[in-house]
Amino acid sequence: MPLTRRSFSKFAIGAALVPAPAIWTSARAQAQPIKLGCSLSLTGPLSSVKAGLVGYEFWRDDLNAAGGILGRPVELVVYDDQSSAAGIPAIYSKLIDVDKVDLLFSPYGANLTAVIMPMIKQRNKFIMGMFGISNNDEVKHDKFFQIAPWGPKASSDWCRGFFDIAKAQSIKKIAILAADAEFSKAAAAGGEKIIKEYGFELVLNQTYPPSTQDFSGILRNLKAAAPDAVFVCSYPPDSTALLRSVTEIGVGDSVKLFGGAMVGPQYASLLENLGSSLNGVVNFHTYVPEPTLRSAGIEKFLARYAPVAKERGIDALGHYIPPFYHAAGEVVAAAAKGANSLDETKIGEWLHKNPVDTIVGRITFDAMGDWTERRVLMVQFQGVANRNIDQFRTAGKQVVIDPPALKSGDFIPFAKARG
């Protein structure tokens, strides 16, 4: 049966439990599985995030091989949300009331997560947030924990690194281009706050429909405003269209810094398709293979991920989403073991008080469930060639400019970086 919201056909990734290792007793082997539930964008415009499923699966398989959580195996219950918020409340109601899952992962991103947060708070459920921005700012749910490294005060500060670069380059005038969508609007609003804080002049603040493919008129407005920097808040389809338009039309000679909050240039398919159109762009990321970021945990994960990605035809690199989806599982397991319970209140209380070591590093959560330390990367694309995905597996193509502690190279002004 196809995966649709209407049928709620369960994606068969966890129904068959991993065989119990020999060290399990028969009582343990017969224990009821602990169910972790979520929706995932397996189809639709956000389907690149389905690579995160591999992160969940690796975590589940390794955990079950080691004895599970509290002596019980872990099962994943995942539904396709088709990249649409419309069916997500019904999916999560089903996960809670019909599937009786023990703990939840959110959908991907701010747009899809926003529609369930009131229900999650009302039902008092524990949930791991998967890359949304500011989803807990209004709800203030004490059992929400964000796996992305946005840091505290994420609504404004998650992209602060972009503006720190602007400040270092003596930027004076900034323009904002933002899609009319939850994530992009939140990012733009955060950018406005920092622009005001840093004393920059906001010369253009333009919102456009997320379906926009022709950016010629917007780029004409941009050139007329003559900004020194352009802060872009976009999702994959409009990120692609905008960068192609920039290559064809340009942004004007005044622009030294371009990018910031573009979702899309983290994914292998867009990197390969856009190629040299990316040069000079400075944009957020969570992991790139620069020497300042390499670690044994990430290296091992990516080596294991590569053949699976090739077999399934998913994101070839797996840098952005998959390691953090694995880490989300690690956080849940550590909290349940630390609390010695599946009681959601106890798990939440434990996480607010204790750090968790994961393949993406040590994570400590604040009162809002965000990381206590911002670890968002601002990377600049430099010397990128066309149609060569392997170049992104090596250092030097996505150079870390910010934060300073992880810097791996020097910033190059936009026009110069584009040759």
Which role does the model predict for each range below?
Residues 22-40:
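C-terminal segment of N-terminal export signals and the immediately downstream linker at the start
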Residues 7-26:
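N-terminal export signals
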Residues 246-326, 392-396, 407-418:
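Extracellular/periplasmic periplasmic-binding protein-like sensory domains
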